[in-house]
Amino acid sequence: MMKKTTTELTTVAKGCAFALVLGVVLQFAACSKNNNINPSDEEILTKKIEDIIPQKYVDSLTKLGFTINKGTTPPNVDGAYLFKPFTIKNSNIPNDPYQPGYVLNDGLIKLYEQSTSDFSIKMLGKNFIGAADTSVVTAISGSGNKFTVYGKVKAYRNGGYNFYAFLMSGEKDGNNIKNGIAGIINIDDSHTGPNTIAEGQGRVAFDGDYTSGPTDFNSKTVGIAERNTFSSKPSQFK
């Protein structure tokens, strides 16, 4: 009789232990599923940025002096802005003719349709990368008045194409952007043509008077806005 009772108690104990383990597993699975269904703002933004530029290339640009403004509460930056004098800050391109202090053609950027729910934003540019560059995906981070815009651009040149990351940071100040700075870096040169910078190479340039004021942006000269197309003077910044 005692042996039977012990066996029954052991069976009950094993059953309770199994139920406890199963409950923990189900709870963990439910939490994981819930996180996938309702990701945090940080998770949404991090994923979007990772789809644009690998972290190693973010690190490369910051080593060249580019500033990343993190956060999920960027200011609204819709508008068109002029970078003048658009001045080279640094480069990691061997024998680059564009040395620090070199003044490029004026840079123009148009930012529009900024979203506070998924941190997307549309962007058009002149004199940043080259002709017929297409923005594949964009994102914006920041907090307070400071922000960073991230764009992935497919640029065609000399019979091939490359994917570049184009980043721009600054501080919104009324209708202006203060301390505007831009960086480009080649993130995929697997289909490149001749005379194009290699993967991992890039440049950083800034607004030399530290104030990028509002400007008229003639989209007819840079492509079709509905397709989120970039275009600028060829070969200026690549």
What kind of feature is each model-predicted range?
Residues 3-18:
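Bacterial N-terminal signal peptides that target proteins for export
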Residues 26-30:
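C-terminal motif of bacterial Sec signal peptides marking the signal peptidase cleavage site
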Residues 32-98, 213-238:
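Amphipathic/hydrophobic helical signal segments and adjacent flexible N-terminal regions
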Residues 104-107, 131-136, 160-168, 180:
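Short, surface-exposed coil-to-beta transition loops
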Residues 113-117, 138-146, 171-178:
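A short, structured loop/turn motif at beta-sheet edges
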Residues 163-238:
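Glycine-rich, aromatic-bearing surface loops/beta-hairpins
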